[in-house]
């Protein structure tokens, strides 16, 4: 079972979200109950207690919620080196749906920052395989993502994760990360592209057609607003129902903290509209 090998949290409510229809089906039987599954993919260095605040948005409304954050060293170093180790984690995450026998329920992803997006890109690839192609994804919410090759922003994010580490170790890791990015994604970019596609490019060209909601802020210093706006334009060009909301003043992954009521209403309305469709 994937559950034995993955550090995740799942919350299953006592009552489902709602029924497929408010009235009996034409055959006279009660309509089948829908219980949406929401998978939260945390940002690099995110703690479960941080994701729990977002989890409550959906759990209080009767949704099954799975929370997971990929290890920060995989997010910052494995992906930068072109090592697809996150693909294994993405597969285990999707296997959880079968372990809990919820693979037939409508599925929504809520993805945070580039750390969540790096994992999500492999989810998209796995959804094209025989094992997972029947999963019913109804929508994706992106919070403060995706960003495209912002080294300064990535260094800020990594520095925040390493804040409590020894000063010398923190400096060494930051320098090592910067060197890896410059070497593999600038100097050797043509060679790297032969065996590894950047997650931003992968998302731009993704064949998924379910609705997407992008929540971002022009005040974000980690993921630039222009990167998200460019992604929205690319998805719209591929005829995906993509919508974006600019919170203007909130910092990176801080939109819920600064605008709790508005943020919650956006997520709940999007989830409900996606499930009903």
UniProtKB/Swiss-Prot annotation:
Transmembrane segments: 171-191
One GO term describing the cellular component: nucleus
Membrane topology: Single-pass membrane protein
Keywords: Developmental protein, Dwarfism, Membrane, Nucleus, Transmembrane, Transmembrane helix
Chief place where the protein resides: nucleus
One Gene Ontology term from the biological process aspect of the record: negative regulation of osteoblast differentiation
Lineage top rank: taxon: Eukaryota
SUPFAM superfamilies for the chain: alpha/beta-Hydrolases
InterPro entries assigned: AB_hydrolase_fold, DUF829_TMEM53
Coiled-coil boundaries: none
Subcellular localization, as worded in the UniProt entry: Nucleus outer membrane
Gene3D superfamilies reported for this sequence: alpha/beta hydrolase (3.40.50.1820)
Keyword Transmembrane assigned: yes
Pfam families: DUF829
Disease as annotated in the protein's UniProt record: Craniotubular dysplasia, Ikegawa type: An autosomal recessive, sclerosing bone disorder characterized by proportional or short-limbed short stature in association with macrocephaly, dolichocephaly, or prominent forehead. Radiography shows hyperostosis of the calvaria and skull base, with metadiaphyseal undermodeling of the long tubular bones and mild shortening and diaphyseal broadening of the short tubular bones. Affected individuals experience progressive vision loss in the first decade of life due to optic nerve compression, and deafness may develop in the second decade of life.
Function text: Ensures normal bone formation, through the negative regulation of bone morphogenetic protein (BMP) signaling in osteoblast lineage cells by blocking cytoplasm-nucleus translocation of phosphorylated SMAD1/5/9 proteins.
Similarity remark: Belongs to the TMEM53 family.
Protein's recorded name: Transmembrane protein 53
Species annotation: Homo sapiens
């Amino acid at each position: 079972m994937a559950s034995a090998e993955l550090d995740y949290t799942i919350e299953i409510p006592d009552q489902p979200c709602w029924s497929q229809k408010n009235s009996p089906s034409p055959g006279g039987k009660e309509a089948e109950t829908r219980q949406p599954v929401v998978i939260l993919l945390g940002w690099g260095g995110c703690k479960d207690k941080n994701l729990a605040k977002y989890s409550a948005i959906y759990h209080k409304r009767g949704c099954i919620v799975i929370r997971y954050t990929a290890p920060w060293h995989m997010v910052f170093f494995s992906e930068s080196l072109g090592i697809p180790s996150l693909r294994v984690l993405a597969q285990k995450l999707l296997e959880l749906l079968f372990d809990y026998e919820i693979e037939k329920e409508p599925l929504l992803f809520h993805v945070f920052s580039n750390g969540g997006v790096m994992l999500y890109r492999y989810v998209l690839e796995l959804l094209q395989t025989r094992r997972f192609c029947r999963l019913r994804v109804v929508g994706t919410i992106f919070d403060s993502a995706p960003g495209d090759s912002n080294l300064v922003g990535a260094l800020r994010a990594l520095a925040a994760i390493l804040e409590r580490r020894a000063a010398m170790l923190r400096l060494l890791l930051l320098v090592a990360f910067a060197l890896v990015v410059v070497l593999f994604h600038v100097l050797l970019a043509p060679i790297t592209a032969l065996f590894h596609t950047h997650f931003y490019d992968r998302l731009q060209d993704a064949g998924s057609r379910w609705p997407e909601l992008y929540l971002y802020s022009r005040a974000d210093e980690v993921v630039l607003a222009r990167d998200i706006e460019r992604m929205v334009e690319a998805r719209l060009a591929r005829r995906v129902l993509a919508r974006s909301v600019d919170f203007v003043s909130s910092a990176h992954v801080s939109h819920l903290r600064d605008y709790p009521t508005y943020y919650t209403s956006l997520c709940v309305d999007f989830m409900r509209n996606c499930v009903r469709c």
